[in-house]
Amino acid sequence: MPGRSRVALVLLAAAVSCAVAQHAPPWTEDCRKSTYPPSGPTYRGPVPWYTINLDLPPYKRWHELMLDKAPMLKVIVNSLKNMINTFVPSGKIVQVVDEKLPGLLGNFPGPFEEEMKGIAAVTDIPLGEIISFNIFYELFTICTSIVAEDKKGHLIHGRNMDFGVFLGWNINNDTWVITEQLKPLTVNLDFQRNNKTVFKASSFAGYVGMLTGFKPGLFSLSLNERFSINGGYLGILEWILGKKDAMWIGFLTRTVLENSTSYEEAKNLLTKTKILAPAYFILGGNQSGEGCVITRDRKESLDVYELDAKQGRWYVVQTNYDRWKHPFFLDDRRTPAKMCLNRTSQENISFETMYDVLSTKPVLNKLTVYTTLIDVTKGQFETYLRDCPDPCIGW
């Protein structure tokens, strides 16, 4: 009994230390300034652009991109398989993924199944592993998204894509394995029809859903994971068992980006469509007041929190916790983000200062793969690979 008490005290002390660390130097810092244009140790580099031709058959749309990125995709798929085999050394789970997963999941909606088949063919990676790579993003996306309105009613959308928590820690360089392997897979995409842009997005090569994007002149959209007991695993299980009346969240965001023609239409679809996993949809428009965070359960919308500059609400911030609840004490990115926005002020919000906010620890952390900045009205869309050199919190 005394031994158990000592273990409990050690665990409690460790948890308290981590909680305190996230809110004290060197794990946090004063709000950064003058970090834009990106440079220095927190800037890994630019993100390449590729065109996805929607006039091509779905099977062929990703051919050019995946020829370039196949080696990097194989690296991350092999890492995921190795992690699975660590827990189930027999290799049976990977065998089921390769042989059974496509049949278990059945037909995917719209063009997505044919697109994944095309990616599998080009990369010589089994279709089941390509499907599991796409499912992966329904479950592990940890992010910070912001929509802010300046004094002139102009909107700016910013997001940090954080990904890879608990998916392998490299003790040699203090980084998350999957986070680092995603950086060379990060791409900017220009989806075109009839040689004209339909929408633009930042994504990971091999993933056919969308996590961050915008429709020039109309709206911007980012997706954050929402942790819930009634979560994505249940939705996927229902899908396998034949209940297919809900959409995969990444497929929904892509469908909205591709087909919606206004902020209100996008908001309506994101609010009402049944989805497989709980999520936060962060949506920005092209005029004053058009910005919101949609908190979703799998079957319904729980909350739509909108900009209202006249009432002093000139920004909305979303991490991975419901806005009416306190964030998990080991993972509070919301408080420092809001603090830095308040210090920036509505008079001074811009691409430059939004990047400053997203560059401040712990909003920037070891999980941060990239930062995206969007100006819908001006048609600006910029994505930058990030690093968080030590001392830096793990999430």
UniProtKB/Swiss-Prot annotation:
- Where is this chain's protein located in or outside the cell? Lysosome; Secreted
Tell me which residues are glycosylated: 195, 259, 286, 342
Q: Which GO terms describe its biological process?
A: cellular response to tumor necrosis factor; ceramide biosynthetic process; ceramide catabolic process; fatty acid metabolic process; keratinocyte differentiation; regulation of programmed necrotic cell death; regulation of steroid biosynthetic process; sphingosine biosynthetic process
Q: Where is the signal peptide?
A: 1-21
Question: What happens to this protein after translation, modification-wise?
Answer: N-glycosylated.
Single GO term (MF): fatty acid amide hydrolase activity
Q: Known catalysed reaction(s)?
A: an N-acylsphing-4-enine + H2O = sphing-4-enine + a fatty acid; N-dodecanoylsphing-4-enine + H2O = dodecanoate + sphing-4-enine; N-tetradecanoylsphing-4-enine + H2O = tetradecanoate + sphing-4-enine; N-hexadecanoylsphing-4-enine + H2O = sphing-4-enine + hexadecanoate
- Cite the EC number: 3.5.1.23, 3.5.1.-
Q: Give the record's GO CC terms.
A: extracellular space; lysosome; membrane
Q: Which InterPro entries match?
A: Acid_ceramidase-like (IPR016699), Acid_ceramidase_N (IPR029130), CBAH/NAAA_C (IPR029132)
Give the active-site positions.
143 (nucleophile)
Key words of the record: Disulfide bond, Glycoprotein, Hydrolase, Lipid metabolism, Lysosome, Secreted, Signal, Sphingolipid metabolism, Zymogen
What are the site positions for Important for catalytic activity? 162, 320, 333
**Alphabetized Pfam families for the sequence:** CBAH (PF02275), NAAA-beta (PF15508)
Disulphide bridges: 31-340, 388-392
Pathway, per UniProt?
Answer: Lipid metabolism; sphingolipid metabolism
Q: Which domain of life is it from?
A: Eukaryota
| Job description of the protein | Lysosomal ceramidase that hydrolyzes sphingolipid ceramides into sphingosine and free fatty acids at acidic pH. Ceramides, sphingosine, and its phosphorylated form sphingosine-1-phosphate are bioactive lipids that mediate cellular signaling pathways regulating several biological processes including cell proliferation, apoptosis and differentiation. Has a higher catalytic efficiency towards C12-ceramides versus other ceramides. Also catalyzes the reverse reaction allowing the synthesis of ceramides from fatty acids and sphingosine.
- Please give the subunit comment from the record: Heterodimer; disulfide-linked. The heterodimer is composed of the disulfide-linked alpha and beta chains produced by autocatalytic cleavage of the precursor.
Q: Which PANTHER family does the record associate with it?
A: ACID AMIDASE, ACID CERAMIDASE
**What family name appears in the similarity comment?**
Belongs to the acid ceramidase family.
Q: What is this protein called?
A: Acid ceramidase
Taxonomy of origin reads: Eukaryota, Metazoa, Chordata, Craniata, Vertebrata
